[in-house]
Every structure is written in structure tokens, then in C-alpha cells.
């Protein structure tokens, strides 16, 4: 993934298993690896020591730890690596979220990125298309307020006339917004307001098609996207050992 903030052409990231998603065997939960402060903190610190550029702090309502609390707690331990903080926008009021983003970015010295999740409010359910439309409104509100601009927004989901919070990010702008989703509504949302479009493992031809499609959608809006790719990696001393482990 191309990184605008640093001089490296590619950002190499890891993730901390806040959603009880640290498995020895993919998709098979292990009670010994459930999320806890100690376990997830150690993942973050090991990733930083190993030279990773960024680390995802995922978020889910039912599983694991609260991502906002964990991000604030781990931030003082992180002195080089960026945090990719997952935010469930269906659970947040955008002006208050803008203030939290600015505060956490300050604590991190400007090393914050935000993974936008188009979530429901727990206990409620919204159809996919309006949920993504609400997410687009939220992303645009965040970008306006975190750029220090007065917000005058009248949308389907938010009707706001408000000044930005006094707390500013280190850059005076909104941190990069990462966003993933393959449905047409999700792709439109990413093209409209995200900065980095996240993808999942697939064949090279299919990934190439997705990238071309997303570039075209963004270009229609006079925008450009960067791209991220998530993959599960099995590392051993030799390729034969890695393949043998993968076949278990």
C-alpha cells in the first residue's frame, strides 16, 4: 500500500487480536488466545519491535475488548509505529468522534490512521445501502471538522451546524481513512470519501479488476484512492516447512 505520510513506497502492517481472533488454525477460536490487555499489548509491542509500520486495532461489538479504550491505553507505549484504529461509525456521533480522533492523534504524535467500519448501532439494524450512505456522511463530517472548518451539514442522517473542536490533529487535517467492502454500496462509499481501500486475498486477476473498478469510481468524483491488501502469512525457515504447516 502506498504511504503518503512517510517516504516508503509501501506500508507493511500487522494486527492486534482485539476481537478474540488470534488463531493457531484459521477460523478455529482458541480460548487460550482470547483478547486481553496483556495479550494484545504484547502483540503491539512485538510488532513495533519487529519493524512494522502500522498495526490494526480491530473492533467488534460482541467479541473482545473495546478498541477505543485499548487504543488510548496502548498509545503511550508506541513511539514509532502508527495505529490503525477501527471505528464503528454507527455507534458514534461524528462531532464527538472527531474530538476523540484529534486527541488520540495528539497522544501518538500524528501517527494515527482510522479504519472506518460501517456498523449498526447495537440492538438496531439498518439496511446495507442506507447504512453505507450514513457512513459516507460521517466520513465527510470528520474530514470537515478535523480540517478545522465550520460544519454546515444537512443530510439524510445528520443535520449539523457546529464549529470544530478546539483539539486539532498534529497535521491539522483528518488522518487517513481506511475502508473495505466489496458490495456496490460499499465500493461507492469508498470512492466517495475514503482514502485507502482495503481488499482481501483473491487471484491477481480479480484483485486487478477490483483496483481498476475502484480507480474508475473515484475518478468520476475527481478523487484518487490508495489500496491495501490483507493476507494471512505462514512463515517458517523454508518454503517446504511453511507449506507443510499450512496443510495441517
Residue ranges and their predicted role:
Residues 58-66, 90-95, 203-209, 234-237:
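Acidic-and-aromatic substrate-binding clefts and catalytic sites of carbohydrate-active enzymes
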Residues 5-33, 92-153, 157, 201-215, ...:
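Flexible, glycine-rich active-site loops centered on histidine and acidic residues
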Residues 47, 51, 74, 104, ...:
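Conserved, mostly hydrophobic/aromatic
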Residues 22-38, 86-95, 170-182, 233-236:
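Active-site mouth loops of central-metabolism enzymes
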Residues 229-243:
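Short, conserved secondary-structure transition motifs
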Residues 10-16, 55-57, 82-87, 112-116, ...:
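Hydrophobic faces of well-ordered beta-strands that scaffold small-molecule active sites
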Residues 1-78, 154, 172-175:
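N-terminal beta1-alpha1-beta2 module of alpha/beta enzyme domains
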Residues 6, 45-49, 71-80, 101-112, ...:
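Acidic (Asp/Glu)-rich catalytic clusters
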Amino acid at each position: 500500500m502506498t504511504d503518503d505520510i512517510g517516504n516508503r513506497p509501501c506500508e507493511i502492517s500487522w494486527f492486534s487480536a482485539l476481537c478474540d481472533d488470534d488463531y493457531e488454525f484459521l477460523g478455529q477460536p482458541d480460548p487460550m488466545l482470547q483478547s486481553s490487555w496483556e495479550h494484545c499489548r504484547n502483540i503491539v509491542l512485538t510488532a513495533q519491535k519487529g519493524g512494522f509500520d502500522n498495526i490494526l486495532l480491530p473492533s467488534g461489538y460482541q467479541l473482545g475488548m473495546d478498541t477505543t479504550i485499548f487504543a488510548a491505553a496502548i498509545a503511550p507505549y508506541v513511539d514509532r509505529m502508527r495505529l490503525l484504529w477501527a471505528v464503528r461509525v454507527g455507534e458514534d456521533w461524528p462531532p464527538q468522534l472527531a474530538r476523540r480522533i484529534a486527541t488520540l492523534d495528539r497522544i501518538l504524535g500524528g501517527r494515527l490512521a482510522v479504519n472506518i467500519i460501517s456498523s449498526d448501532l447495537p440492538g438496531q439494524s439498518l439496511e446495507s445501502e442506507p447504512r453505507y450512505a450514513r457512513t459516507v456522511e460521517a466520513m465527510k463530517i470528520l474530514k470537515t471538522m478535523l480540517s478545522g472548518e465550520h460544519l454546515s451539514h444537512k443530510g439524510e442522517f445528520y443535520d449539523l451546524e457546529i464549529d470544530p473542536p478546539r483539539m486539532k490533529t498534529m497535521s491539522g487535517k483528518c488522518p487517513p481513512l481506511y475502508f473495505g467492502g466489496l458490495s456496490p454500496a460499499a465500493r461507492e462509499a469508498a470512492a466517495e470519501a475514503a482514502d485507502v481501500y482495503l481488499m482481501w486475498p483473491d487471484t491477481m486477476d480479480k484483485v486487478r479488476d477490483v483496483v481498476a473498478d475502484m480507480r474508475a469510481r473515484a475518478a468520476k468524483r475527481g478523487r484518487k484512492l490508495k489500496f491495501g491488501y490483507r493476507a494471512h502469512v505462514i512463515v517458517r525457515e523454508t518454503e517446504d516447512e511453511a507449506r507443510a504447516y499450512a496443510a495441517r
